UniProtKB/Swiss-Prot annotation:
Its EC number is 2.7.7.27. Alpha-D-glucose 1-phosphate binds at Y113, G179, E194, K195, S212. One of its GO terms (biological process) is glycogen biosynthetic process. It comes from Haemophilus influenzae (strain ATCC 51907 / DSM 11121 / KW20 / Rd). It catalyses: alpha-D-glucose 1-phosphate + ATP + H(+) = ADP-alpha-D-glucose + diphosphate. This is Glucose-1-phosphate adenylyltransferase.
Amino acid sequence: MEILMKSGDLNKYDLVKNALVLVLAGGRGSRLHELTDKRAKPALYFGGNRRIIDFALSNCINSDLNRIGVVTQYAAHSLLLHLQTGWSFLPQERGEFVDMLPARQQIDDSTWYRGTADAVYQNMAIIKNHYRPKYILILAGDHIYKQDYSVMLMDHVNSGAKCTVGCIEVPRSEAHEFGVMAVNENLKVKAFVEKPKDPPAMVGKPDVSLASMGIYVFDADYLYKMLEQEVNTPQTSHDFGKDVLPKCLEEGALYAHPFSRSCMGRNTEGEIYWRDVGTLDSFWQSNIDLVSENPQLDIYDQSWPIRGNPIQAYPSKFFYKHSNVHPVDNSLIGGGCVITDASISNSVLFDHIKIDAFSKVDHCVVLPQVKIGKNCVLKNCIIDRECEIPDGMQIGVDMEEDKKRFRISSTGKVILVTSKMLKILEGHEIGEEGHLD
């Protein structure tokens, strides 16, 4: 099929049906510590009843990009189960799918995915011979945002680029965590450096850098060529940002797509929303932000819905027998929760949580199937799945005491509590892997 380069001649349907999306979902997220010991970062819970990967997948479906492969590797069981139960609704007879592409050591018997580029390279035979796309959209499965990818795809074809990278303006003080680029007036990338120690500023904006979002659109044939070159390059990191994009830049084939062009669901001030929830502080803050009256991220927006696992829990119920107990305030409550004479404020509670009488939960993110006993006080906490908080326990009240028992975030503000930590406090033998570091 011949795609004309004039925007008026471009047909969105033709573009999306000839595109394949690859969601890279194999990362651990080591800065989240024990939260990702048993689950990949994209499988981590978010927003009361969703997983992080649901945002990328919902963006695909809302963008009419219904040919999706999810590349998995680290601790993939919960992620694969979520994809099977929540994302198997596309009609395969129409060529639509969410396929799982786990690491299978396809190149030889000893090598798993060695980087983002290698993850795609190891699946290249399947992509070329089975999916046969004309365009390939590659994105990370561990960011929180809403974007119409079809707009980025349209811009890619319009520009004549071989590779297009999504970009966003970030504070220069934070840009060392990203690939940073400079572009000309036509958005052609003129310079690119991955995670620089001293990030360059944008022209006229000394405190702002233009950062890569880790989202790429490639002409499929061009991507195959670049990956074949990359795998045979000595001392390669097998990484798109470090290895592939600089080669695209050398060939003059790299263009940028500003996120502002395709962002969906701006807030009332017109601000765009994109978060890398890669630390305990950012994960906690991004969840807590949702409880405000007008949050930057609107999870109730039906014009751009964020789908998830359709399994329905029973309704939550609340018992308040004592008038001196302050009830639920400014909080998100999942399904199947039972709250009895407990005070909950500025918190996000996921499904199937039980909180007993006279406990206080403030500015907490509580993951599913947690039990909180009587007379507990929890402040500024992330409570991992299946924790049982004993009667009278106080967390977030005495930080020096908490440092001896739990994981404290790098800012010293957020406390992570897991079931292993609680079992150690109770004196249970849980093996060497349960020791705190």
